Amino acid sequence: MMSYLIVFFGAGIGGMARHMVNLTAMRWGLTEFPFGTLFINMLGSFLIGAVVETFALKAGLPQHWRLFLTTGILGGFTTFSAFSLETVLLYERGKVFLAASYAVASVTLSVGALLLALHLVRTLIRG
């Protein structure tokens, strides 16, 4: 039960941070291209790499902190960071083809699922 609360509070912090970055990008007039989201994805990927490597190299760090930072805060900030980590882990394990396949499939299927949802909802609502 405690792990659920750790993730819950972390995700709230991450979600608020994502919202703040997007609002800042809009205030700066960056509306033609999703710069806020691009920044969030890059920063989240960098941070999850730093956190995971720190926990891997430093024994004795409490795992509830890893859960709070990665699944919680960074999961709420961006799910792209988890995708980036999983792709790199496959690559580092020598599964280059699997890593590339996962990256291509994740992007293609995710965008495809969104397009399908748009089509279905528009069809249902418009009749």
From Swiss-Prot:
Q: What is the protein's species of origin?
A: Granulibacter bethesdensis (strain ATCC BAA-1260 / CGDNIH1)
Q: Per the record's keyword annotation, is Secreted included, yes or no?
A: no
Write out the catalysed reaction: fluoride(in) = fluoride(out)
Protein name (Swiss-Prot/TrEMBL):
Fluoride-specific ion channel FluC
Q: Which UniProt keyword terms apply here?
A: Cell inner membrane, Cell membrane, Ion channel, Ion transport, Membrane, Metal-binding, Sodium, Transmembrane, Transmembrane helix, Transport
Q: What's a BP term from Gene Ontology annotated to this protein?
A: cellular detoxification of fluoride
Q: Which residues cross the membrane?
A: 1-21, 32-52, 71-91, 96-116
Activity modulation comment: Na(+) is not transported, but it plays an essential structural role and its presence is essential for fluoride channel function.
UniProt-recorded Gene Ontology molecular function terms: fluoride channel activity; metal ion binding
Main localisation: membrane
Locations listed in the record? Cell inner membrane
Annotated positions binding Na(+): G75, T78
